[in-house]
Amino acid sequence: GDADRQRIDDDVFRRAAHFLSQESVATFDRIHNHATWATAGVGMTGYLLGDADMVERALLGSDKSGQAGFLRQTELLFSPNGYYTEGPYYQRFALLPFLVFADAIERNEPERAIFEHRDGILLKALRTTVQLSYRGYFFPFNDAIRDKSLRTAELYEGVAIAYGQTRDPALLWIADFQGRTVLRDSGALVAQDLDAGLAQPFPFASLLLSDGPDGDQGAVAVLRQGSANAEGEPATVLIAKNSAQGMGHGHFDKLAWQLYDNGNEIVRDYGAARFLNIEAKRGGRYLPENETWAKSSVAHNTLVVDETSHFGGDADLADQFWPTQLHFSDAPGLQVTSAEIDSAYPGVSIRRTPLMPTLPGLEAPLVIDLVRASSDDAHQYDLPLHFSGHIMEYDFETRNNVAARPVLGNDNGYQHIWIDAEATLDEGKGALTWILDGRFYTYRFVS
């Protein structure tokens, strides 16, 4: 009856909203995905209860000044083209409160035009999330669990809500890949229009995604080429991670790169050290090895100086600096991205330029990776390559550790690397070939 309804309204919904927005102000007013969930919950509760003050707190922050709250989060957590600063894994995660609350705002207060706010940033963010994937799986840089894909609750909701707003037939292509939609009016529209054959291929493309609220804190470069795979996207993708740190979930991997080809991750990123929701593995939380290995520079395809991680492994320091994106071109025939950073190590400037040329008569993809480090002092430079596959051959003499298994170092990730074999290169040159899924890959290096 009415008494029960009032009791639930007052003792469940209002009490929870009060706890989140007035007793937990430090979390509620953060510019962070934790606050996005809190503001979305309070705002949607406000709409349910007809409480305009609650909605205002959610949109504008606990003091309703606009310096915090949901609207401010859309302005500071995404770059102008919809890249979320923590990376694709958390972009997927945060899209749920962003889009579900935005959908509620649109239903209750269409005059706010939330989907037009900041030049349509939330719809850009949804499309950018899809662009940051290969065969449906997100590029696993920063803290990322590698088996998260477009087939997740956040993206079922997000694709349906975005389609309801835009009627973009490319989103139907993604919904078809997902194989399901959600029980809401926009979900019914997705199913109906898919059945009517209105889907068009999603435009996977080479693109430069700026980082930072003003787009001036580095970038993520995505270079795509080759004939389309089963998912309708180019078969070869190179990612250059020239972005900002991405707060606490960021890794120390400035100017790192990854490569996908032939349906597989070839030059790989470890992602996060975590068994999500597995109670026996530290309650499903991040493992200690996330700090000691997964975040370390040597765990990535980046230049490591003096066996230490970028910024000394200090996330607060790293948040203050980012690479400078020097050049980007998606011109057919020669795609290129170039960036530099002089703050990852004191007194060391690093520039990296990956190129993807298309050469007549060469069927397989080719990547040229130019790395230059300069310093007034002598340093040890290590350039790891983490790849997927089985080693076939190499053109240098190795000294194999068959009786014992030493480790490479004592700290900064090096303590986790076993030395299987070592070699001295002839004139700084060498080549190594491995096989993955019926295709050979050769890495040639010269210094």
Indicate where each model-derived feature is located.
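A short, hydrophobic secondary-structure junction motif
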Residues: F13-Q22, R127-S133, W293-D306, V371-Q380, ...
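Polysaccharide-binding surfaces and accessory modules of carbohydrate-active proteins
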Residues: A378, H386-S447
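C-terminal, helix-dominated tail/subdomain
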Residues: A113-A191
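Aromatic-lined, polymer-binding surfaces characteristic
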Residues: G1-V130
